[in-house]
């Protein structure tokens, strides 16, 4: 809120504050602006309402002042008058149609303001004009909430008498009684209870009114609620009872009352903390703790993380409370889940008095805690020298390591407190002792840039060139973390060797470069020229081995964007085109990451721009284009020689323009085109940048290419144009732009690819309805061209009913009976894939249900052979397909269903057959459906066939009955025939005897190598729909040599 000086305000405002109506009238007569607004948008009427001056208010309104003007906080004059409890001013404003429902920025109405300010008379004037007294503000609070919070009993009575909802809750589910209890307004609480308020209600966190009163120490409310019988041990959402809350807030009077009433002093919350834990930790919990301990609280109870109340006193430094707990029988060396005792905790947080108390009480200073550390480890690590001194005085071996081999001196060196370090050194700590990682205290001091500790350790004789398990010296760590170079400089002055390489082949120069520490690099370079250092370090003169890393400091600085470090490196390192294991140069990495300053530094020093890596054969220009770093790209192109560098190709023939379009980097696309990039350049698959834009759908890139003359009908190695690809991928915006471009040059967009497919085929196959609609608007697509496997075939085979419907609507119903090169109609395709909705659509357009393809198969046969039960049911029931038709091998639909073992389909067909001749119809191999069903073990079908009069004596071309057809091979069938002949003593003239011996006599050869198999006519034909069509195999177009667009045409189905 802005406080303005009255003397700086207009005369009218000054007159209002002076309370002089005559002067106000005179100023208005002189045309003073009655609607003037200050910088808080307050008007003179706001001022008069604030002062409650009814006469001036009316005078201003009659002179044209806006009665509902809002200031910057959306407060109206009525809000101001109510806040000032001026009944007369409110009456005048209401008389002049002030808005009683006006809301400020907190959504508070004048009634909210009245309730909060005890303006009972004002509220009485407002309430009759309101339709609802339960309107809530932004926090969800009603006027009753505000009245209860402010303790205004008369206002509460008024609101309740006018229909206020006593149990209304705000956005935290708190009711009026919560706020009254929290503020200690006992009379309001009683009033609310007498009107039916729930005393056990809970907010969103399950706090009850008792929790609220206990937290703020309102003892009178607490006693009243307890007298009403509320549960004093009721937990909130965190498991805290009112006793927990009172202890946490140090409300000892409430704690005493709750304990006297029988509250459970040992009840745990969700984390296992008791009230005693809270009392031990809280700022004002000392008296609470005394009360709890005196009333039987368990001083050794542990939380879920193993902490006792003594741990809590140690954590927060509650010295006197720790003494009380210890005197009450607390276990001194109890451990939490990390193994830390209270002494560890006190040492970690530097509570010296607590440490003294704990040691005096017998705490074990040599007890191990987290990671096997002593309390002295933690005190040294945190830099508390007085605590270290106390712990040392208890006496134990200071060189004893923790679980990782680190001594207290390691901890002090890492913590950086010189006093702690010197204390340990003077006590005899071993400064060369190494941990399990091979690191000495000097390694830790260097890694944490603790110059004073490093100085003291080196001065004590610590070895500066000791290697850890990774082969790193303290200098490596200093190079990593030392921004101002002090530690590194001191190590160099004390004979640290900057040429030592770790096990990965990195020396201090690498680490300084990786972290961008320019000063460190300058210091190292001042000792030894970097080129000499890089050449000589890492080699073994005796073994002729070389452990130098393939990544140079130049690579590291360039990759991480440390251009200042790079400037130092390029002054000394001559080979700027050094390559890593994949052949990438520092310039390549800088361009790839978009570090313009690094690119600039390297180019200015003569780094090669057109050098290619080993893997993808890409240059830095490709790297910048791939990731969309336009500034780097401009720098590289502008400094590249020759000029055709803009079209340089990688190993797959891709240009920077192609890569920019592929990744949607419009800025880079324009930069390359403006530099003369060949817009129609092709890669090794014959694809241009426009092909990539069509696949990825980057419309802005496509527009840029078309503006620069890109040809939209160029074909790739599979004959596909960008129009094909955009239609296949469903990018309607790109497709529209390409069609418009084709039209503008009088080109035919309905070209076909190598398999005869047009863009319409592809759009239909993938179900991109918006693309189908757009293509059908073009005149050239109003007739079916290309592969006989038509767009309608493509749509129905993938269940794209919407696309199919569009095609029929646009091209006419005659297309539903179009056939492909094998004579199959769209109905065959729908039947093959069991797409019932498409099947219904085709049948509704008079598709010929009994049309046969080149092998004589009808859609029903196709569905039966492939077990498409939904299609079979529709065709035999709704479409009345002809069940008597036979294919070229004389198989009926029933033969085909049985031959492939599709029992449900066979039963559906059988349900519609009543003609015994059809039941016993034979195919070219003289097999009846019973032969085929029995051979495939279709029990229910066999049973149904027999029930419908199927002949059990019918013989096929091998002379076998259906029973013999069940045999797995010829020999078994012959044996079975012999057994049957023996079992049935009939005359030689019996048909069965003749049949059986005919079957036996057909095979006089006893060779067991001849097996009984299904006849060729029942085998899977080469023309079956094993793979109906693979036109849509291409879901993504990634431009690599192993991810080509899939071959597909109707020959594969």
Swiss-Prot record:
Entry comment on modification after translation: Ubiquitinated by the ECS(RAB40C) complex leading to its degradation and decreased PP6 activity.
Quote a single Gene Ontology cellular component term.
nucleoplasm
- What SMART domains does the annotation carry? ANK
- List where in the cell it is found: Nucleus, Nucleoplasm; Cytoplasm, Cytosol; Cell projection, Lamellipodium
Q: In which tissues is it expressed?
A: Widely expressed (at protein level).
Q: Where are the ANK repeats?
A: 40-69, 73-102, 106-135, 139-168, 172-201, 205-234, 238-267, 271-301, 305-334, 338-367, 371-400, 404-433, 437-466, 470-500, 504-534, 549-578, 582-611, 616-645, 652-681, 685-714, 718-747, 755-786, 788-817, 822-851, 855-885, 889-918, 925-954
Q: Which residues form a coiled coil?
A: none
Q: Which domain of life is it from?
A: Eukaryota
**What keywords were assigned to this record?**
ANK repeat, Cell projection, Cytoplasm, Nucleus, Phosphoprotein, Repeat, Ubl conjugation
* Residues with Phosphoserine modification: 1007, 1011
Q: Which SUPFAM superfamilies match?
A: Ankyrin repeat
Question: PROSITE patterns per the record?
Answer: ANK_REP_REGION, ANK_REPEAT
Q: How does it assemble?
A: Protein phosphatase 6 (PP6) holoenzyme is proposed to be a heterotrimeric complex formed by the catalytic subunit, a SAPS domain-containing subunit (PP6R) and an ankyrin repeat-domain containing regulatory subunit (ARS). Interacts with PPP1C and HNRPK. Interacts with PPP6C, PPP6R1 and PPP6R3.
Function comment: Putative regulatory subunit of protein phosphatase 6 (PP6) that may be involved in the recognition of phosphoprotein substrates. Involved in the PP6-mediated dephosphorylation of NFKBIE opposing its degradation in response to TNF-alpha. Selectively inhibits the phosphatase activity of PPP1C. Targets PPP1C to modulate HNRPK phosphorylation. Involved in the PP6-mediated dephosphorylation of MOB1 and induced focal adhesion assembly during cell migration.
The molecule here is called Serine/threonine-protein phosphatase 6 regulatory ankyrin repeat subunit A
Q: Which organism is it from?
A: Mus musculus
Gene name of the record: Ankrd28
């Amino acid at each position: 809120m802005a406080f303005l000086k009255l003397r700086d305000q207009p005369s009218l405002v000054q007159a209002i504050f002076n309370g002089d109506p005559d002067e106000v009238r005179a100023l208005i007569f002189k045309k003073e602006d009655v609607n003037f607004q200050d910088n808080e948008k307050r008007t003179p009427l706001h001022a008069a309402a604030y002062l409650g001056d009814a006469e001036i208010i009316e005078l201003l309104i009659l002179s044209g002042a806006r009665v509902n003007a809002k200031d910057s906080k959306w407060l109206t004059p009525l809000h101001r008058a109510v806040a000032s409890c001026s009944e007369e001013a409110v009456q005048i404003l209401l008389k002049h149609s002030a808005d009683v429902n006006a809301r400020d920025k907190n959504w508070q109405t004048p009634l909210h303001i009245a309730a909060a300010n005890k303006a009972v008379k004002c509220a009485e004037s407002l309430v009759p004009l309101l339709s609802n007294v339960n309107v809530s503000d932004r926090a969800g609070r009603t006027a009753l909430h505000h009245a209860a919070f402010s303790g205004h009993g008369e206002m509460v009575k008024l609101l309740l008498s006018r229909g206020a909802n006593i149990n209304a809750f705000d956005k935290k589910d708190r009711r009026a009684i919560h706020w009254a209890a929290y503020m200690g307004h006992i009379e309001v609480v009683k009033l609310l209870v007498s009107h039916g308020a729930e005393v056990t209600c809970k907010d969103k966190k399950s706090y009850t009114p008792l929790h609220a009163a206990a937290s703020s120490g309102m003892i009178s409310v607490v006693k009243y609620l307890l007298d009403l019988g509320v549960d004093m041990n009721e937990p909130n959402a965190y498991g805290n009872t009112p006793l927990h809350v009172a202890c946490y807030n140090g409300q000892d009077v409430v704690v005493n009352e709750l304990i006297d009433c029988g509250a459970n002093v040992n009840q745990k919350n969700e984390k296992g903390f008791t009230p005693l834990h809270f009392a031990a930790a809280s700022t004002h919990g000392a008296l609470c703790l005394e009360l709890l301990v005196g009333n039987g609280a368990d001083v050794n109870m542990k939380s879920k993380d193993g902490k006792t109340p003594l741990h809590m006193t140690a954590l927060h430094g509650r010295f006197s409370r720790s003494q009380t707990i210890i005197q009450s029988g607390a276990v001194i060396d109890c451990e939490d889940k990390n193994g830390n005792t209270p002494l560890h905790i006190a040492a970690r947080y530097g509570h010296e008095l607590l440490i003294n108390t704990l040691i005096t009480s017998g705490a074990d200073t040599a007890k191990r805690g987290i990671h096997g550390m002593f309390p002295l480890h933690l005190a040294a690590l945190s830099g508390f020298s007085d605590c270290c001194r106390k712990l040392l005085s208890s006496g134990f071996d200071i060189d004893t390591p923790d679980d990782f081999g680190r001594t207290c001196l390691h901890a002090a060196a890492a913590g950086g407190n010189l006093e702690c370090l010197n204390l340990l050194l003077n006590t005899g700590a071993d400064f060369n002792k190494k941990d399990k990682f091979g690191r000495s205290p000097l390694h830790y001091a260097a890694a944490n840039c603790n110059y004073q500790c490093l100085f003291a350790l080196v001065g004590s004789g610590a070895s500066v060139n000791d290697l850890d398990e990774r082969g790193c010296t303290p200098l490596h760590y200093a190079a990593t973390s030392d921004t101002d170079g002090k530690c590194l400089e001191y190590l160099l002055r004390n004979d640290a060797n900057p040429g030592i390489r770790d096990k990965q082949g990195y020396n201090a120069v690498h680490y300084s470069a990786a972290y961008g520490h320019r000063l460190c690099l300058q210091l190292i370079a001042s000792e030894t020229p970097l080129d000499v250092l890089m050449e000589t370090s890492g080699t073994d003169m005796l073994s002729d081995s070389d452990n130098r890393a393939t990544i140079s400091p130049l690579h590291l600085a360039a990759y991480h964007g440390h251009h200042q470090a790079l400037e130092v490196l390029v002054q000394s390192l001559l080979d700027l085109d050094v390559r890593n294991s994949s052949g990438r140069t520092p310039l390549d990495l800088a361009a790839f990451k978009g570090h313009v300053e690094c690119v600039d530094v390297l180019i200015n020093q003569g780094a090669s721009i057109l050098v290619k890596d080993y893997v993808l054969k890409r240059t830095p220009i490709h790297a910048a284009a791939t990731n969309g770093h336009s500034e780097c790209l401009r720098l590289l192109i502008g400094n590249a020689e020759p000029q055709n560098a803009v079209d340089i190709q990688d190993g797959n023939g891709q240009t920077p323009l192609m890569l920019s379009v592929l990744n949607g980097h419009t800025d880079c696309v324009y930069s390359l085109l403006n530099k003369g990039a060949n817009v129609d350049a092709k890669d090794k698959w014959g694809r241009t940048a426009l092909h990539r834009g069509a696949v990825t759908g980057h419309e802005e890139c496509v527009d840029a290419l078309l503006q620069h003359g890109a040809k939209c009908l160029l074909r790739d190695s599979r004959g596909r144009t960008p129009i094909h690809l955009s239609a296949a991928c469903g990018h309607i915006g790109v497709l529209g732009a390409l069609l418009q471009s084709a039209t503008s040059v009088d080109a035919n967009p309905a070209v076909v690819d190598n398999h005869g497919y047009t863009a319409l085929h592809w759009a239909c196959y993938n179900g991109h309805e918006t693309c189908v609609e757009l293509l059908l608007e073009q005149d050239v697509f109003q007739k079916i061209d290309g592969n006989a496997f038509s767009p309608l075939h493509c749509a129905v085979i993938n269940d794209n009913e919407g696309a199919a419907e569009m095609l029929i609507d646009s091209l006419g119903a005659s297309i539903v009976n179009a056939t492909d090169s094998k004579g199959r109609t769209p109905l065959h395709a729908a039947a093959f894939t069991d797409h019932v909705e498409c099947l219904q659509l085709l049948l509704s357009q008079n598709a010929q249900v009994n049309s046969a393809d080149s092998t004589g198969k009808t859609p029903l046969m196709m569905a039966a052979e492939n077990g498409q039960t939904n299609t079979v049911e529709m065709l035999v029931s709704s479409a009345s397909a002809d069940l008597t038709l036979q294919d070229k091998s004389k198989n009926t639909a029933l033969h085909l269903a049985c031959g492939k073992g599709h029992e449900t389909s066979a039963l559906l067909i059988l349900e519609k057959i009543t003609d015994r001749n059809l039941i016993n119809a034979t195919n070219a191999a003289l097999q009846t459906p019973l032969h085929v069903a029995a051979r495939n073990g279709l029990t229910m079908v066999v049973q149904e066939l027999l029930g419908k009069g199927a002949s059990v004596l019918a013989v096929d071309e091998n002379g076998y009955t259906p029973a013999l057809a069940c045999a797995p091979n010829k020999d078994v069938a012959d044996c079975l025939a012999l057994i049957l002949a023996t079992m049935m003593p009939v005359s030689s003239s019996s048909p069965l005897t003749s049949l059986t011996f005919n079957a036996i006599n057909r095979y006089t050869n006893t060779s067991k190598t001849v097996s009984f198999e299904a006849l060729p006519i029942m085998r899977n034909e080469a023309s079956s729909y094993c793979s109906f069509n693979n036109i849509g195999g291409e879901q993504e177009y990634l431009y690599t040599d192993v991810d080509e667009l899939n071959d597909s045409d109707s020959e594969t189905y």
